[in-house]
Amino acid sequence: MPQDVDFHIPLPGRQSPDHARAEAEQLAWPRSLGLIRSDAAAERHLRGGYADLASRFYPHATGADLDLGVDLMSWFFLFDDLFDGPRGENPEDTKQLTDQVAAALDGPLPDTAPPIAHGFADIWRRTCEGMTPAWCARSARHWRNYFDGYVDEAESRFWNAPCDSAAQYLAMRRHTIGVQPTVDLAERAGRFEVPHRVFDSAVMSAMLQIAVDVNLLLNDIASLEKEEARGEQNNMVMILRREHGWSKSRSVSHMQNEVRARLEQYLLLESCLPKVGEIYQLDTAEREALERYRTDAVRTVIRGSYDWHRSSGRYDAEFALAAGAQGYLEELGSSAH
């Protein structure tokens, strides 16, 4: 049921014209860094459709810029899978790995860092190419929030203290869904930067939060059966059932309505952007960057997520694992010696 749940997304679907080439070459990068070694891991990775996802998130990107987006999507899901199992239920083990990965934001990693950390270091190096120090600092801040969120989730599992309310869950999950770093990369892939004085404006912040919320609601629907099998309790469907005593179908219907309401608000916020440009006295180039952010970053991460979730093999029933089983085929989080 979950991947077939319909959401009305009033935004056009787009895809990079270079998607076929990127899809054919998507295993080259993770294999070169030892992130995918076995044929089984390669087959499972291909089933996820991560090149398809990147080509929808970054439809304006081609060549090396699209490849960076594909590699980021590959890395995201390889990293996330490392926490499906005992590590993700142990806050100390989780923090040890997230700290090792986040260290790449501060400088070169030691050779003994785990493969998943070296993968992130390569992505971060390429991400910062051609971007201003202020942009890199902003993106690094978003990445740190992302890594911190994994520790929060592990704490919740360790203490068997699932979120009591939708509001509590959203506050935690908004970081680990990874939308903000994903949207950041749209600027890098498109070789533009939103004016920094506008980024934290009320309108922009509200637009981005809607993009984050829609993504996590879509993801929770798609991954519901997988998480039910694992005994995961922090999923919006389950939380709504606990909080309100609703049935599964009513909880899903409520989430559909939430997405619809948020997107109506999003379109209203979009209509305010010309006024934002006036208030912040943006010049022509800055207004163009703001418009590109609207069309090539925020919109595409909303619509692209929806289209990918409906077709990705990542959420197929065969990948649903029992509680305590590890969700990855290859250990990428252990330090090399």
From Swiss-Prot:
Stated consequence of mutating residue 219 to L: Loss of activity
Effect of residue 84 to E: 2.5-fold increase in activity. 7-fold increase in Km for FPP
Top-level EC class as recorded in UniProt: lyase
Pfam families the UniProt entry points to: Terpene_syn_C_2
Keyword Cell membrane: no
Swiss-Prot/TrEMBL cofactor(s): Mg(2+)
UniProt protein name: Pentalenene synthase
